[in-house]
Amino acid sequence: MPRPSPCADSGGGMMTTLTARPEAITFDPQQTALIVVDMQNAYATPGGYLDLAGFDVSTTRPVIANIQTAVTAARTAGMLIIWFQNGWDEQYVEAGGPGSPNFHKSNALKTMRNQPQLQGKLLAKGSWDYQLVDELVPQPGDIVLPKPRYSGFFNTPLDSILRSRGIRHLVFTGIATNVCVESTLRDGFFLEYFGVVLEDATHQAGPEFAQKAALFNIETFFGWVSDVETFCDALSSTSFARIA
């Protein structure tokens, strides 16, 4: 049975049901946000941080194309689109010093310490690395949020932005599935948001099993998993059913 929207009895909404794992989920697109996580040169382009740190980014182009498709469908359906950019100020104060676990675990910070010539070039606001990829351009009405850690809920206004608009459902795309996408979806789960990830609009940092493990965790414990074609079909005009 489809998981009903908590807003299903509000009246007058346009509901759609998205086929997903482990079961379908019903939601109102206008009370749903599409979250695009960290589609920056750092994570999706050769010469960016992940590439320089030794992660494979050679298969990110189809993900970018799928995100373009999902964004277009979401915008047409009246969904709020929120873009995240991960990174810090040019002096890396926001990244934290030795007293922060982020200092020790961030692969970007470790890469710069190991390769001093990269200092100031990775994930620094204003840098090429920090910029969104050329193919993905926010439009008027979209919201672009910087974030200093993996989760988009940590030290950002995301929660208040969503609650003030009555949004309870979040559809996730972006990189990396097993890091920032999963972290944000998990935090959303703890804050009572319904999270769906579009698996072919995401990409892992690390081997393929990291992608599979993240998707398993999400569909089993924290949310739902679908794909871009199914999402677009659900948002097509023939899929909507007006609530009486």
Swiss-Prot record:
Keywords: Hydrolase. SUPFAM superfamilies: Isochorismatase-like hydrolases (SSF52499). It catalyses: (Z)-3-ureidoacrylate + H2O + H(+) = (Z)-3-aminoacrylate + NH4(+) + CO2; (Z)-3-ureidoacrylate + H2O = (Z)-3-aminoacrylate + carbamate + H(+); (Z)-2-methylureidoacrylate + H2O + H(+) = (Z)-2-methylaminoacrylate + NH4(+) + CO2. It holds the Pfam family Isochorismatase. Signal peptide: none annotated. Its EC number is 3.5.1.110. The active site is at D38, K147, C180. One of its GO terms (molecular function) is hydrolase activity, acting on carbon-nitrogen (but not peptide) bonds, in linear amides. One of its GO terms (biological process) is nitrogen utilization. Induction: Up-regulated by the nitrogen regulatory protein C (NtrC also called GlnG) and repressed by RutR. InterPro entries: Isochorismatase-like_dom, Isochorismatase-like_hydrls, Isochorismatase-like_sf, RutB. PANTHER family: ISOCHORISMATASE-LIKE DOMAIN-CONTAINING PROTEIN (PTHR43540:SF6), PEROXYUREIDOACRYLATE/UREIDOACRYLATE AMIDOHYDROLASE-RELATED (PTHR43540). HAMAP family: RutB (MF_00830). Belongs to the isochorismatase family. RutB subfamily. Hydrolyzes ureidoacrylate to form aminoacrylate and carbamate. The carbamate hydrolyzes spontaneously, thereby releasing one of the nitrogen atoms of the pyrimidine ring as ammonia and one of its carbon atoms as CO2. This is Ureidoacrylate amidohydrolase RutB.
